[in-house]
């Protein structure tokens, strides 16, 4: 059986299709992918993954499997690799020969860096090798779970991840630590898992390269290894910065994202685009490094201020406008009650709880369908960038919360789409009305600075490989097209006309608690990462 697990082409697209056709659930497919590295795997983790298969294949025997896996995890050999135990058995010579052969045939099977990635490449050359060409590929796996009460002692989500490893190194948002720090400590203590906790303040003003450097130093001091995922517990800023630190540490260290905010829960958390701000620019530095698992637990939403909840909704609206009409309609029907009840986490209404879950699930599904099919941004047909074309240029200077800046970008994008004839005036107003009904910004005085907005457009064009490729609703709500040309003059004219349109909406299009300082955060326009870029003398040779 072990060899069958090892031989499976678990990272191929065909494997996904055949597994689905065979009736295997998502959790089972994920387990099979990791079991490619079965020989190098701690036996505690091995039997934990086999239990996940048993839940799908032999559910009547699940309890027996769970008890046995728990005994193995806590037993004397729970953290020993399977290959180590096999070499101690009666077939030592057989396994020595097998492992020697696998060093050449399938090195991932016995010496993997982690169970979550696989790579391959083909090299061709001419003559004696003075000209060489190669194609390289990497496959990475991830899981996403929307759940509740993950810190309840009865929950085994974190237990199954970290008990086989014997410890957990966790980066925790200081605000989360204040509200849930003791619960985190108690969970790991109850299950006998050593916890090393690194607590960081993670406000927008902290999102610079210095924070990433500090995280890297703490990882070194904690002795983080590439076979143990770091547990990141926090919101969007921590998802971005700690994710970037994991991408840089050992050039690739896995991490699990336990999302405690809306932005982290359905956008920054599962995103492969880790990043930090620098030189006054939003997300200037970054790397592509998706978490191996994202856990969105709306239990944490209860402690969030209304302003933090509100601005997170923008990332859901963006997916609804360009990807999911049904989600858009659900947001219209449910309205601000989502914010008031913390997405159903703080209400006795079964209907609102169910709606909150439906919204989160639909937003997550739409987001990852768009994101994971273009993991390294090798093209710019990216619907999830709606609202993010011009906003990176004015978010920090204006001191706005990210969601409000995105709201302005989405509203302006809907207006541009209308000018292109891609949507009707009714559809334009419907989009703007939804943004406004969630008290998000359609307008901000910073948009009067058309030169600043055009500069943002030029920078994003550089970032997008020479194309503007601004995603906008096209052909109706729930579908997407891309605007690739907009002159300085047309941009300025559109902004002026858009301002007049915004004045017809509540608050003249202004958002409620639109700025960081209004929701208890420092103003990034004052204390943010605005160190000027030192420009060396450049010699131009013609």
Which positions does each model-derived feature cover?
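ATP/NTP phosphate-donor binding region
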Residues: 4-229, 541-542
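Active-site segments that bind and position negatively charged phosphate/pyrophosphate groups
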Residues: 334-450
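A glycine/threonine-rich phosphate-anchoring loop and its flanking beta-alpha core
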Residues: 244-340
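Solvent-exposed alpha-helices and their adjacent loops that cap or buttress functional pockets
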Residues: 136, 163, 222-225, 248-250, ...
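A short, small-residue-rich loop immediately preceding and capping a beta-strand
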Residues: 222-260
């Amino acid at each position: 059986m072990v060899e069958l697990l090892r031989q499976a082409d678990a990272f191929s697209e065909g494997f996904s299709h055949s597994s689905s056709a065979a009736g295997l659930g998502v959790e089972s497919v994920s387990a099979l992918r990791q079991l490619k590295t079965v020989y190098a795997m701690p036996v505690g983790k091995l039997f934990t993954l086999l239990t996940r298969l048993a839940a799908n294949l032999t559910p009547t025997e699940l309890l027996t499997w769970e008890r046995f896996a728990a005994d193995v995890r806590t037993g004397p050999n729970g953290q020993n690799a399977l290959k180590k135990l096999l070499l101690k058995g009666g077939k030592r010579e057989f396994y020595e020969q097998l492992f020697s052969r696998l060093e050449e045939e399938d090195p991932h099977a016995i010496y993997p860096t982690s169970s979550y990635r696989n790579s391959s490449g083909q090299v061709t050359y001419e003559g004696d090798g003075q000209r060489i060409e190669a194609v390289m590929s990497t496959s990475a796996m991830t899981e996403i779970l929307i759940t509740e009460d993950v810190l309840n002692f009865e929950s085994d989500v974190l237990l199954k991840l970290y008990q086989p490893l014997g410890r957990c190194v966790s980066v925790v948002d200081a605000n989360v630590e204040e509200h849930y720090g003791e619960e985190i400590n108690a969970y790991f203590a109850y299950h006998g898992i050593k916890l090393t906790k690194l607590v960081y303040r993670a406000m927008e003003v902290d999102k610079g390269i210095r924070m990433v450097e500090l995280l890297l130093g703490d990882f070194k001091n904690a002795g983080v290894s590439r076979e143990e995922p770091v547990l990141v517990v926090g919101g969007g800023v921590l998802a971005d910065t700690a994710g970037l630190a994991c991408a840089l540490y050992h050039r690739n260290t896995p991490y699990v994202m336990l999302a405690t905010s809306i932005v982290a829960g359905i956008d920054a958390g599962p995103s492969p685009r880790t990043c930090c701000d620098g030189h006054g620019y939003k997300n200037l530095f970054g790397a592509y490094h998706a978490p191996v698992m994202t856990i969105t637990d709306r239990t944490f939403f209860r402690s969030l201020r209304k302003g933090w909840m509100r601005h997170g909704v923008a990332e859901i609206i963006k997916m609804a406008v360009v990807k999911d009409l049904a989600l858009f309609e659900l947001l219209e029907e449910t309205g601000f009650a989502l914010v008031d009840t913390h997405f159903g986490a703080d209400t006795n209404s079964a209907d609102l709880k169910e709606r909150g879950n439906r919204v989160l699930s639909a937003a997550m599904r739409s987001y990852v369908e768009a994101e994971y099919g273009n993991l390294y941004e090798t093209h710019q047909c990216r619907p999830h960038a709606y609202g993010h074309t011009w906003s990176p240029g004015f978010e920090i200077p204006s001191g706005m919360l990210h969601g409000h800046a995105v709201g302005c970008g989405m509203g302006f994008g809907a207006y541009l789409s209308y000018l292109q004839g891609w949507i009707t005036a009714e559809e334009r107003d419907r989009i703007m009305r939804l943004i406004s009904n969630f008290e998000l910004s359609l307008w901000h005085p910073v948009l009067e600075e058309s030169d600043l907005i055009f500069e943002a457009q030029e920078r994003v064009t550089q970032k997008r490989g020479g194309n503007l490729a601004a995603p906008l609703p096209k052909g109706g709500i729930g579908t997407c097209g891309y605007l690739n040309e907009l002159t300085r003059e047309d941009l300025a004219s559109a902004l002026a006309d858009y301002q007049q349109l915004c004045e017809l909406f509540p608050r003249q299009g202004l958002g409620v608690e639109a700025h960081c300082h209004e929701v208890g955060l420092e103003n990034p326009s004052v204390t943010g990462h605005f160190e000027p870029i030192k420009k060396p003398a450049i010699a131009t040779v013609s």
